[in-house]
């Protein structure tokens, strides 16, 4: 997000505003101060806009013509909530998501207007980039709509890490003679070339089934369970079965609701292998180092 946010305006004759001294929790005040036309954000920034309560209902955000996020995935409920927030404040920008990483030289995809921004959709590969899906841990290329590891070939890829072992794991020469970047992210690509990013790494559960955080979050989001404002999964190693994992669900509830009120509907909408071991309530989504603090909850 940072690299794109700097390169895009510099390469297109736009005014670039850099503010390294803004406290993240005051991002709403800075937005109202500078009134940006284009803003490449992270989900944490939008969450602060929504929940800080300092942007009044009648505040006009029509100056914002382009808005989107990177850094981490947004589930369907987050996407709907953020799009509604923009619309309620007279902003007609389409809220979008992108995908990239430092190792790939920043952005790897570009949102496309004809396609809905849901279910982990991050758009199509940027020009000159080649993105393909491979069976995790192999060089076997998969077909459309098959979930596997997202890999990228292109001139923007890094030269390597300081650690040769990590470099060899990330940059692999395939049988086609190309050096592919293995991102470690799992997803799939549709026949139209639209990439969907679903989770980080493979997380098989004992008894069968691979746990994908965004896929499970979207199922709960699409169930539209009354009382749930926001939710996210945390996947942790299964101490009883090495190499296997367990899911836990964290929810932010509307006033007056308890976990007991929503638990049955959560279990009903999910496949059995996706059932959370437990459901915990939080007052709000926690962030650390600009991302949802899943590590701190493990």
PLM regions and their residue ranges:
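AMP-binding/adenylate-forming catalytic domain of the ANL superfamily
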Residues: 268-292
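Alpha-helix capping/helix-boundary segments
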Residues: 45-46, 74, 157
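Conserved AMP-binding/adenylation subdomain of ANL enzymes
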Residues: 1-38, 52
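General small-molecule cofactor/ligand-binding pocket signal
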Residues: 17-19, 96, 279-283
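Short Gly/Pro-enriched turn/cap motifs at secondary-structure boundaries
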Residues: 120-125, 177-178
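Conserved beta-loop-beta connector loops within the AMP-binding
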Residues: 132-151, 188-192, 259
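AMP-binding/adenylate-forming catalytic core of the ANL superfamily
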Residues: 39, 154, 159, 169, ...
